Curated annotation (Swiss-Prot):
CDD domains tied to this protein: 7tmA_OR4-like
Main location: membrane
Keyword Transmembrane helix part of the UniProt annotation: yes
Topology versus the membrane: Multi-pass membrane protein
Glycosylation sites: N5
Gene name linked to the record: OR4K2
Gene3D superfamilies hit by this protein: Rhodopsin 7-helix transmembrane proteins
One GO CC annotation: plasma membrane
Cytoplasmic topology ranges: 50-57, 121-139, 220-235, 290-314
Statement: the UniProt record of this protein carries the keyword Disulfide bond: yes
S-S bonds: C97-C189
Residues exposed to the Extracellular side: 1-25, 80-100, 159-195, 259-269
Protein name, per record: Olfactory receptor 4K2
Length: 314
């Protein structure tokens, strides 16, 4: 964006999900509860994995990083939306809008690569178990996580740099509860067809391609598991099922929004709520409900906490 344009446009108005006061109060309560649940649930996973030595394995190291990303993804816009519903203040500065775009694509891009790393971990564990220790070493796990963040930063920087080149001519109303390129593009004084192609090529195709790779890897894993009836295979099937549910819930909305960036705003708003608020809340539930090791570790952590409180002098 040129300097003259930026000086005349200093903020956007976030229209949110509804203009109805009753619905806004409803959203305020629901999203407040979901946000607290997201932070508590994912924090419990992180603390449990750190405290319990039985969970010091590559799979749970990656799961811990997924929980950290989910907490970050839920925090880049949800707290502002909650306070906006309470105060009625719905504006965001131009720099604040760019910041939201940056962090949204940073966390989603990082999560996409991390989910692929988790899929690779399960593929090696189930399809090539004899090579697991040598292939998925602690160094490899750290490298996968670092690579995820680096690729997330590169992707988000490309989105922000492109947004900086856009001229805006008003009205400066973002038809969503946070800034993202599909809705911000609608305010630009340029051909939206070209902008749509940019979104599809830099986000939509990447998300779709990664989902196809993940889907194929889980199909291979499930076919491998089908030929075994051991308890270990049953455990592997349960873990992979949980992973795939997470992948589907996260990728589905992203693919729709970025493969069809000029689609209905109402549909986009609903899907945006899903992958920025609901999915980070559901991930801890999905993993703990289908994972006996995590549930046992959490019970131990709870008992240690209760015993510590009993031992404290009154």
């Amino acid at each position: 964006m040129d300097v003259g344009n930026k000086s005349t446009m200093s903020e956007f108005v976030l229209l949110g999900l509804s203009n109805s006061w009753e619905l806004q109060m409803f959203f305020f309560m629901v999203f407040s509860l979901l946000y607290v649940a997201t932070m508590v649930g994912n924090s419990l996973i992180v603390i449990t994995v750190i405290v319990d030595p039985h969970l010091h394995s590559p799979m749970y190291f990656l799961l811990t990083n997924l929980s950290i990303i989910d907490m970050s993804l839920a925090s880049f816009a949800t707290p502002k939306m909650i306070t906006d519903y309470l105060t009625g203040h719905k504006t965001i500065s131009f720099d604040g809008c760019l910041t939201q775009i940056f962090f949204l694509h940073l966390f989603t891009g990082t999560e996409i690569i991390l989910l692929m790393a988790m899929s690779f971990d399960r593929y090696i564990a189930i399809c090539k178990p004899l090579h697991y220790a040598s292939v998925i070493s602690p160094q490899v796990c750290v490298a996968l996580v670092v690579a995820s963040w680096i690729m997330g930063v590169m992707h988000s920087m490309s989105q922000v740099i492109f947004a900086l080149t856009l001229p805006f001519c008003g009205p400066y109303e973002v038809d969503s509860f946070f800034c993202d390129l599909p809705v911000v593009f609608q305010l630009a004084c340029v051909d939206t067809y070209v902008l749509g192609l940019f979104m599809i090529s830099t986000s939509g195709i990447i998300a779709l391609s990664c989902f196809i790779v993940l889907f194929n890897s889980y199909v291979i894993v499930l076919v491998t598991v089908k030929h075994h009836s051991s308890r270990g295979s049953s455990k592997a099937l349960s873990t992979c099922t949980a992973h795939f549910i997470v992948v589907f819930l996260f990728f589905g909305p992203c693919i729709f929004i970025y493969m069809w960036p000029l689609s209905s705003f109402l549909t986009d708003k609903i899907l945006s709520v899903f992958y920025t608020i609901f999915t980070p809340t559901l991930n801890p539930i999905i993993y703990t409900l289908r994972n006996q090791e995590v549930k046992i570790a959490m019970r131990k952590l709870k008992n240690r906490f209760l015993n510590f409180n009993k031992a404290m002098p009154s």
